[in-house]
Amino acid sequence: MSIHVVIGYGPAGAATARLLAGQGHSVRVVTRSGRRPEPGIEHVAADAADSARLTGIARGAVAIHGCAAPPYHRWAAQWPQLAASMGAAAEATGAVLVVLGNLYGYGPVDRPMTEDLPLAATGPKGRARAAVWEQVRTLHEEGRIRAVEVRASDFFGPGVTDGGHLASRVVPRLLRGRSVSVLGDPDAPHSWTYLPDVAAALVEAAGAEQAWGRAWHVPTAPAQSARQMVGRLAAEAGTGPVAVRRTPPAVLGAASLFSPLIRELREIRYQFDRPFVVDSSAYESAFAVHATPLDEQIRATVAWWREHGAP
């Protein structure tokens, strides 16, 4: 089988590395701290923004999966160097570069998001993410690398913990039958991308030549409001109805005084105050991976949280 490099070991990086290892590939995971080896997975401690170091790690690999991101409040400062390093490593080794992206680059839109929308975001985080793909796409168009970006909405599912909007702040509480608070309008339709589908799309796109040179949306189930998702999770858990409340702006304002992460959320509040819907039909009509049925997502998520200590 082949060698794959996965940059980052958050929810998406871990899911991608384990999927590849399960398929029999050899996987090298790059993080700053490293970890103990796992079956089929070698963990390497390195700064992925160091292009010479990353190039050495990627020698012999067929693909580099970019699943890492700088700290949320440092995107504008640190994304350019990380993107440049990934591009340089792909060029030096011939590995396909698969970038895990998101939907920030589009900015606020009034329709379901498709890949042909312009990257028109004006905020610093949206511009930073748009610039990553613009930088990588230029290298691809110049014939220097082979690259693809796979864009996901907010992660949901087994393995999604602190960084998810329907994760550690919500699921353990609803499993106890307690009320939950969510960011923005709890009744606004919102697309939630299932984490196993993210990993499956990254792996599939790496090996599909027809995918390269453009961006694709990860197959994503039909949009559901936060209230609908909480209701589905509670029904699966058998806890009975759970109250869903909007986090008061005053609470967010006070918390932002002490938390850089919460402070940075102001730029993307539009994603939760209005419909935020992704159209993934282009990917699903071209490739084998399709969105996992929502009922299956809900069952697996409740089971995972219970297995990992939630009631």
Role assignments for model-derived ranges:
Residues 102, 134-159:
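Conserved beta-loop-beta element that borders a ligand/cofactor-binding pocket
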